[in-house]
Amino acid sequence: MPIVARSSRVPWVIKYRPKRVEDVVNQDQAKKILVPWFKAWLEGRKPDKRAALLYGPPGVGKTSLVEAIASEFNLEMIELNASDYRRRSDIERIVGAASRKRSMFKRGVVILLDEVDGINPREDAGGIEALLSVIKTTENPIVMTANDPWKDFLRPLREVSLMVEFRPLTLTHIVAVLQRICEAERIECEREALRYIAERSEGDLRSAINDLQAVAEGYGRVTLTLAREIVRGREKSIDIWRTLNQVFYKPRQAWMARKAVSQSEKDYEELIAWINDNIPRKYGEPSDLFRAFDALARATVFLGRAKFGGNWELLSYVFDLMGPGVAYARMEGEVLKTRYSYPEKIRMMAQLRGVRETREKLAEVLAKRLLMSRRAVKTEVLPILHYIFRSSRDPTKPAMIALEYGLTEKMVELLAGQRKSEILKAMATVKKARLGEKPLEPQEAKARRRGEKASRDEGRKAGKRERKGVGLDFFLGEQ
């Protein structure tokens, strides 16, 4: 019986993450910069740079070092992903509140904001500005991580942050860590196999540990032959189509389905939505459907407990259930020859997000013109505009409002709903009426302006002549 069976429930990247600062390998220079910065906070001396930006390749220890410092200095760590909290409102509400939080049972609070280079400056307008505002007033240290900190839109963050570079890990360091894990797990391993895994990781220790666990869990030992068979080169992430194929087409080994979901390019909740919508498209037998949905439901339960209870060791059960659990649920029928479908839930969420963004932009436009807050516009003005745009018998009225305030087509659609095309036509008609039936060419417009100026000048001269002929009797009235 393989010895790994008793410990395979916990991902080794979690089980063996550094508990102390000295456990983080090959990052001595980063430690020399970051540890004194944290000590200044703990001693009540707020540094000039209230945020730190850690940058370097994936899997080199950026997050691990912050976790180790928090553990060693007895700090409460609030970890957020910038990809999830990237809009202005999210950052002000979530990150802003965390920046003022006080810990009841520990020495202090540290905020870890992962993947700030994942913020989209076009889609998430205002996110960087909101983050800068939070950094200026924060009462707690803010640590951000990025793989590429030199993107143009991150320049304001670089200027206010302590920049800490993390070096790529060497082959020697990765092999040493893998060797220690094998010894702790009492796994038989070949040095050449560990070196092979380390080479394929391309300096990513986290990926190397995942590959080591995949080999050890599948066979109970780590040999060069097994490593070559299983580790096919570093795949940072597996695209969704390959992930679904590995799940629904029942791989030869359970670990293959598990690896497919654990290294998928999609996050856990999105991946569950993909699998959920495609189970009935691939499985036809009722008993197979029951087992697959049951496994996926249990995966959802464990994911919820991991996220909201903070017990991330349960993540291993999530991988087992939505990977091998769904794959081996098919015991009777064949895989149906139907195409994968895009999850309806994700499609609806994308549409709702677009509606929310349009609503925010509309509120911002109206707030500037009406000298009101955006909140007041949303609660007091938008309901009235909704009624006018959707209930007005004459589409000219809402069309004139839209033109007056410079509303875009999406904003009109938000307010008008099914009457969008009717009001857009009315807007075009009003525009033509304002400009005349034929839009003026530049030369014609110039000639018209000269004519209008000449008419105004002639009017002024006539007025002066009339005033000269007016005597005192005019003002005193007839005697």
From Swiss-Prot:
ATP binds at residues 56-63. The keyword Nucleotide-binding applies. GO terms for molecular function: ATP binding; ATP hydrolysis activity; DNA clamp loader activity. Keywords: ATP-binding, DNA replication, Nucleotide-binding. Gene3D superfamilies: 1.10.8.60, P-loop containing nucleotide triphosphate hydrolases. The keyword ATP-binding applies. Heteromultimer composed of small subunits (RfcS) and large subunits (RfcL). NCBIfam families: PRK04195.1-5. HAMAP family: RfcL. This is Replication factor C large subunit. It comes from Aeropyrum pernix (strain ATCC 700893 / DSM 11879 / JCM 9820 / NBRC 100138 / K1). The gene is rfcL.
